[in-house]
Amino acid sequence: MRHLLALALLCCTGWARADFDANRLWVNAGFYSAHFDSDKGLRNANPGLGFEYRLDDRWSATAGRFINSDNAHSTYIGAYFQPWTVAGFKLGVVGGAFNGYPKAFNGGWFPAVLPVASWEGQRFGLNVALVPPLKDRLYGAVSLQLKVRLP
């Protein structure tokens, strides 16, 4: 976990400022994935720990670790770009890198860009991402990620 936190901080240094705002920091406990192939015995509950820091109204940085649908540990790091807001939801993409999927790239790191919608309240938020299937290497799903701001 130390390496993950160090990597997240390193990636944010380009945007680092002396006036860090804790109200822009979100913490999440992983994902819930509703898989398109529900008959494959995949893990829907994907517990973990992640962080998201809202840089401005359109950009945020994210990193975390979770137990994926193949029941293996995955790490991710990336950035959200959400230039549109419709009915209170920020719309855009999240791009970055993932690892830990045994059938995808031998469990190694791979890039991904996913469409995402986010709702952010005062204390709680929700990210909804569409994960497209990748042949027999990565199973498609709609993934939900609850997030909370710490006081």
Question: What is the role of each PLM region?
Answer:
Residues L25, D57-A61, A87-F89, W119-V128:
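Repeated loop/turn-to-beta-strand initiation elements of outer-membrane beta-barrel proteins
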Residues M1-L7:
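Sec-dependent signal peptide recognition
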Residues A29-S33, A63-R65, V93-A97, V128-P132:
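Transmembrane beta-barrel strands of outer-membrane/channel proteins
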Residues F36-N44, F66-T75, T85, N99-F110, ...:
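Solvent-exposed loop/turn segments connecting transmembrane beta-strands
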Residues D19-D21, E120-P151:
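Predominantly the C-terminal beta-signal and adjacent terminal strand-loop region
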Residues C11-A16:
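N-terminal signal peptide c-region/cleavage motif recognized by signal peptidases
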Residues R17-I67, T75:
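Short glycine/proline- and aromatic-enriched beta-strand/turn motifs that initiate or cap beta-hairpins
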Residues A29, L49-Y53, A63, I77-P83, ...:
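Residues on the lipid-exposed face of transmembrane beta-strands in outer-membrane beta-barrel proteins
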